[in-house]
Design a protein with these regions (language model features):
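Gly/Thr-rich phosphate-binding beta-strand-loop-beta motif of the actin/hexokinase/Hsp70
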Residues: 1-17, 122, 175
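Hydrophobic "anchor" residues on beta-strands that sit immediately upstream
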Residues: 3, 89, 171
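Metal-dependent catalytic core segments for phosphate chemistry
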Residues: 12-57
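Short acidic-glycine loop/turn motifs at beta-strand connectors
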Residues: 17-20, 83, 149, 168
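Phosphate-interacting basic helix/loop segments used at nucleotide- and nucleic-acid interfaces
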Residues: 60-84
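Short glycine-rich phosphate-binding loop at a beta-alpha junction
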Residues: 81, 88-95, 134
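RNase H catalytic domain
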Residues: 94-112
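Positively charged, low-complexity nucleic-acid-binding target-recognition regions
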Residues: 109, 113-238
Length: 238
């Protein structure tokens, strides 16, 4: 099975271990100036007036447009990730979205990217298309680990988008390297030894009436009742 690692971020919404990159459209940021202007006009209208109601509708329509644009983009990305026939396993980091939103410097950007909705859409689409979804530990050093030699570069800063491994000298793109490491971390979490699977009894079409009758007879015997065949025999003997 082909596995895929995904690293979520602010600049690029999703970077995949196969080289694909999905940009973050930043719907709220693009419309933020217009939204602030409409909200300012709304605050200046007299309460209860028809002009205030019209201004409120304009604000609501713009907010709805932003939400629909964001949701449409997330649907397209998650569909592209799960509808690929070659991808059977997706590995992702178990992000603490609520904790990220507590950071006042990142709260608006994280909310605009909508990581929570991305994970929700990806989960149910994976179940639809039969794709395994593996979540790696949120504290795993996916960005700081060299994908070639495994060295953990603890001095990597958040604003460094690329870095060179001090041990082997390999040049890494931060997001792509993280996606590859997330894939490896996820595959290592899979069980290496598989136990014996007990097959489920699934009778053929021709055998189903016989199996259903035998099951019904067993249920009645457990309850202490008389099966259909025994009742018929007793009537014939009479």
């Amino acid at each position: 099975d082909t596995a895929l690692g995904i690293d979520l971020g602010i600049k690029s919404l999703a970077v995949c271990s196969d080289g694909r990159t999905f940009d973050n459209p930043k719907n709220l940021q693009k419309s933020l100036g217009r939204l602030k202007l409409l909200q300012k006009r709304l605050s200046r209208k007299q309460k209860g007036s028809s002009n205030r109601n019209k201004a409120r509708i304009r604000v609501a329509r713009l907010q709805e447009y932003i939400a629909n644009s964001r949701k449409d983009n997330l649907h397209k990305i998650t569909h592209a990730l799960t509808h690929d026939s070659q991808v059977r396993t997706i590995c992702m980091e178990d992000l603490n979205v609520k904790g990220m939103q507590r950071n006042h410097h990142l709260a608006q950007a994280v909310g605009d990217a909508s990581f929570g909705m991305f994970l929700t859409l990806l989960e149910y689409k994976c179940s639809w298309y039969g794709v395994n979804l593996i979540k790696t530990g949120r504290f795993a050093p996916s960005s700081k680990t060299c994908g070639k030699c495994g060295h953990v570069y603890k001095g990597l800063k958040l604003n460094e988008r690329s870095w060179i491994c001090p041990k082997c000298g390999t040049h890494h793109d931060r997001d792509f390297n993280a996606a590859c490491n997330i894939k490896e971390f996820g595959l290592k979490a899979l069980p290496t030894e598989r136990g014996k699977v007990k097959p489920v009894d699934c009778p053929l079409v021709d055998d189903r009436p016989r199996v259903l009758k035998s099951n019904g007879r067993k249920k009645q015997e457990k309850k202490g009742g008389i099966g259909f065949s025994e009742a018929a025999k007793s009537l014939v003997l009479r």
